[in-house]
UniProtKB/Swiss-Prot annotation:
Organism name: Staphylococcus carnosus (strain TM300)
Gene that specifies this protein: yidC
Record-level Gene Ontology MF annotations: membrane insertase activity
Name of the protein described by the UniProt record: Membrane protein insertase YidC
PROSITE patterns membership: PROKAR_LIPOPROTEIN (PS51257)
GO biological process, one term: protein transport
Taxonomic lineage from the root: Bacteria, Bacillati, Bacillota, Bacilli, Bacillales
This protein's record includes keyword Transmembrane helix: yes
Length: 289
């Protein structure tokens, strides 16, 4: 569900980005500009001055700082996702049975009873549906900040990047084909790495994102200052490392924590993972006893 909601969100962001033009001074007004873009511009200028007018380094430091700030939210999301996935191994038969009751319900009372039964299933397997629903929260929290930085780099203000534009082999204030290609490739790899631990039914949407994300990145970067391509490249590189390590760690941890529940389930049902009505006791419930 989260992946399905991500595509419309991405398309909405593309429309928003295409509709905003801060290249002209008279357009640099309004709540969003004054709250996010202007403040992010001030931070970039301060960092650039702090690094002896090295604005490429300033962009890298700012991107890493933002990623580190939202890292706890992202790690919590990885953990909850893997725990939910492991518990679904034994919870799915019960959940499918209740979903059938919801579909067959003809009255409001029947639907309410079925929904209440679904909540009991969640409780039985120590699952919190709100954790899955809030999985996009880290993205929503960082989105205004990221978009503010996007406009700062796409439409640099006078001074700063425009006057001290040299970094590595490219000009931060002008489009650069190679940093554009690097950004596109890295975003493709980031989407690809995220599929490693996904169940087959979720991979189809991820494959679509694997194509759409790089195309969007390349399309925007070709007509933007190379500073934007640098930002996307650093961000994608960080996400590749973060995704790979977090998925490897939390996948193993989730399997270890849920293993006793799966073992108890299989013992009661003779190793069958499709039987219904298993008396699964979570770790939290064990502690209460």
């Amino acid at each position: 569900m989260k992946k399905k909601a991500l595509l419309p969100l991405l398309l909405g962001i593309m429309v928003f980005l295409a509709g905003c033009d801060y290249s002209k001074p008279e357009n640099r007004t309004g709540f969003f500009y004054n709250t996010f873009v202007k403040n992010m511009d001030n931070i970039i200028h301060w960092l650039g001055a702090s690094f002896n007018n090295d604005y490429g380094l300033a962009i890298i430091v700012l991107v890493l700082a933002i990623r580190i700030i939202v890292l706890p939210f992202m790690l919590s999301n990885y953990k909850n996702s893997h725990m939910m996935r492991e518990k679904m191994i034994i919870a799915k038969p019960d959940m499918d049975a209740v979903k059938e009751k919801v579909q067959r319900a003809r009255t409001q009372e029947d639907k309410m009873a079925a929904n209440q039964e679904m909540m009991e299933v969640y409780k039985k397997y120590d699952m919190n549906p709100m954790q899955s629903m809030l999985g996009c929260l880290p993205m929503l929290i960082q989105m205004p900040i990221i978009m503010g930085l996007f406009f700062v780099l796409k439409y640099p203000s006078p001074g700063g990047i425009t006057e001290h534009s040299h970094f590595l082999w490219f000009n931060l204030a002008k489009p650069d084909i190679w940093i554009t290609v690097i950004a596109g490739v890295l975003y493709f790899l980031q989407a690809y790495v995220s599929t490693f631990s996904m169940p087959p039914e979720q991979k189809q949407m991820s494959y679509m994102m694997m194509i759409i994300s790089p195309i969007m990145i390349i399309w925007v970067s070709l007509s933007s200052a190379a500073a934007l391509g640098l930002y996307w490249s650093v961000s994608a590189a960080f996400l590749i490392v973060q995704t790979y390590i977090a998925n490897a760690y939390y996948s193993k941890k989730a399997k270890e924590e849920v293993a006793p529940m799966i073992a108890a389930y299989e013992k009661e049902h003779g190793g069958s993972g499709n039987s219904k009505g298993a008396k699964v006791v979570s770790k939290k419930n064990k502690k209460k006893k």
